[in-house]
Regions:
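Glycine-rich phosphate-binding loops of nucleotide-dependent enzymes
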Residues: 1-341
């Protein structure tokens, strides 16, 4: 883009990403709810001012993560090996655990085994070796339904392919994953009154717009689709949340909202496994951060101390000169990561 502007070209650049807008544009015009709400010169405006224009209220861009000692282990991944659809090892002998009141982050360049790892952890792909232990039970070969019934919530990487049925309305989409559980289902079939009430609660609590549970999922913006998926999953009162790229393709206001909800669960003592390719996201939210490269956790680092340059080198499979390590976990005597270094 810089080369094109140097050649005298005029560029119209459309994005909902705050950083991109501030970096790439000279002037930014903000559209909100279909209306022009203002224009700013990026040399004079701050990120906070632009975010407020975009959302219509003050947005907290820096996440405040309260101190909280972790509790017992909720999820253990032991020597896990998973092959991809082509028969190649996407995950190789991976080890880590996630504890109560902890966000364990996974950082890496997309395509380094994250998708296959999440599928194995959530019961959607059978591993080729190793174990997944959830709340003390080996669930390696258990169904997705059993994972849900045991208290695992899942925010999928692709909300439109895995999280929603786009032709269903929000009442029907709110039932997904709950179709076998009380109070939404019993021996007589689906209780549509309870199901509708559940969808209305999610729409209200998570500020899904438009606030119409009869709206079909495809009619919602990406951010509102994601907020509905997050609300449905969190409403299960899970002991573990597996969040795969939870803010991909959503606006800055929705990002703030989802981050706040994840940290609220952490503060309540829930365990969170977070996978994201956004370095600022995993660094802000995680208590410990596992870095993956070619299907292996190459290191587990302190997200508050590691630099973006060090993370980038680890993600590329290179060895930084010095990386801040996590201390041994209380009560285990084990290193914090369980990675391969």
């Amino acid at each position: 883009l810089d080369e094109l502007t140097d050649q005298g070209k005029t560029i119209i650049f459309i994005t909902h990403k705050l950083g991109e807008a501030m970096h790439a544009a000279d002037d930014v015009t903000v559209l909100r709810d279909g209306e022009n709400v203002g224009s700013v010169d990026t040399d004079d405006a701050t990120r906070e001012e632009l975010a407020e224009l975009m959302v219509g209220r003050e947005v907290i861009l820096e996440t405040d993560k309260a101190e909280r000692p972790p509790g017992d282990v909720v999820l253990s991944v032991d020597d896990l090996t998973v092959t991809d659809d082509g028969g190649y090892d996407a995950v190789a002998d991976m080890n880590f655990d996630v504890r109560e009141g902890e966000v364990f982050g996974i950082a890496g360049v997309d395509g380094n085994g994250q998708s296959e790892l999440i599928e194995a952890v959530t019961g959607m792909r059978t591993p080729d070796g190793g174990r997944v232990v959830f709340d003390g039970t080996d669930v390696t070969d258990r169904s997705r339904r059993e994972h849900i019934e045991r208290g695992m919530a899942y925010i999928p990487e692709d909300r439109q392919e895995e999280g929603l049925v786009m032709e269903f309305d929000l009442v029907e989409n709110g039932l997904l994953g709950n179709q076998h559980t009380d109070p939404y289902a019993d021996t007589g079939g689906i209780d549509w009154g309870a199901t509708r009430g559940h969808a209305e609660d999610v729409v209200s609590e998570y500020d899904v717009r438009p606030p119409d549970v009869e709206a079909e999922a495809h009619s919602l913006s990406g951010g509102n689709q994601q907020k509905f998926v997050v609300g449905r999953e969190f409403s299960r009162d899970p002991s573990l949340v597996v969040a795969s790229h939870p803010t991909r393709g959503v606006d800055i206001g929705s990002i703030e909202f989802i981050h706040d909800r994840l940290l609220e669960l952490r503060q309540e003592g829930k365990a969170v496994l977070l996978v994201s390719s956004k370095l600022d996201e995993v660094r802000q939210l995680s208590d410990r951060l596992g870095v993956v490269h070619e299907g292996e956790i190459v290191d587990v680092v302190d997200p508050d101390a590691v630099t973006e340059e060090q993370l980038g080198m680890l993600m590329a499979g290179e060895e930084p000169t010095s990386v801040p390590q996590m201390a041994a976990r209380a009560g285990t005597g084990a290193p914090a990561g369980g990675g391969s270094r």
